[in-house]
Regions:
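ABC ATPase C-loop
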Residues: 125, 149-150
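Conserved ABC ATPase signature
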Residues: 132-136, 140
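Conserved ABC ATPase "signature" region
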Residues: 110-128
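Catalytic Walker B motif of ABC-type/P-loop ATPase nucleotide-binding domains
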Residues: 157-160
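ABC ATPase NBD coupling module
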Residues: 67-80, 109, 183
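Conserved signature/switch motifs of ABC ATPase nucleotide-binding domains
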Residues: 131, 152, 184
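Helix-to-loop junction immediately C-terminal to a conserved catalytic motif
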Residues: 51
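The feature captures the beta-strand-to-loop junction immediately N-terminal to the Walker
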Residues: 36-38
Length: 217
């Protein structure tokens, strides 16, 4: 399993001011790191940099001490991102969205079928496996995106506000599943504005006013 490090990074979207300055954080195997802050504080920006979607304006993002390249490079290293907007293909079924992703990252069709079923079941989605994404509710879509991320079994799992549309029972279940990923050995980074969800994590990094402050180092 791998260690993710952000080293003194300034992060800015193209042509814009830095959203975050001088961020340093490490997420190691077996732990869940909560990244908290209000809307617009930079949670998605930080996870985008960790996922290889946003090159730092300065500083570095490292996987096991080696510089992280673009998103393709991150995927090849086992960095899985569950995006805030779910990123699902509306014209595919829930099961197809997951199976396609597993096969695209090297899984066999048989393995994809097995992992898909194993990921959908604990999220209460077995009955929706063959429904199109556009037919699912917002909460069901969010859970499908989570299932896809879990099915990929990454070394690093980045979860961006993945409980925002879920009720209390499903939020608790998702946190249990993230904990299971950490127990498997993954480094899990969970961006959330939910204090209860953050409290269930091992450490908490809070973003505010362009800076990152440790609440629980």
């Amino acid at each position: 399993m791998k260690t993710l490090t952000v080293d003194d990074a300034d992060l800015a979207w193209e042509g814009g001011r830095p959203v975050l300055k001088g961020v340093s954080v490490t997420a190691g195997p077996g732990e869940i790191l909560a990244v908290t802050g209000t809307s617009g504080a930079g949670k998605t920006t930080l996870l985008s940099a960790m996922a290889g979607l946003l090159p730092p304006a300065s500083g570095r993002v490292l996987i096991d001490g080696s510089p992280l390249g673009d998103r393709d490079h991150a995927v090849s290293l086992g960095v899985v991102l569950i995006p805030q907007d779910n990123g699902l293909a509306a014209i595919l079924t829930a099961a197809e969205n997951i199976s396609v992703a597993v096969i695209a990252t090297g899984g066999t069709p048989a393995e994809a079928r097995r992992r898909t079923a194993e990921a959908l079941d604990p999220l209460g989605l077995s009955g929706q496996a063959n429904q199109l994404i556009e037919e699912l509710s917002g909460g069901q879509q969010q859970r499908t995106a989570i299932a896809r991320g879990l099915a990929l079994r990454g070394d690093v799992l980045l979860a961006d506000e993945v409980t925002s549309e879920l009720d209390a029972a499903n939020r608790e279940r998702v946190i249990e599943l993230l904990r299971a990923e950490a127990t498997r050995g993954a480094a899990v980074v969970f961006a959330t504005h939910d204090p209860e969800a953050a409290a269930a994590c091992d450490r908490e990094l809070h973003l505010a006013d362009g800076s990152a402050l440790w609440v629980r180092p």
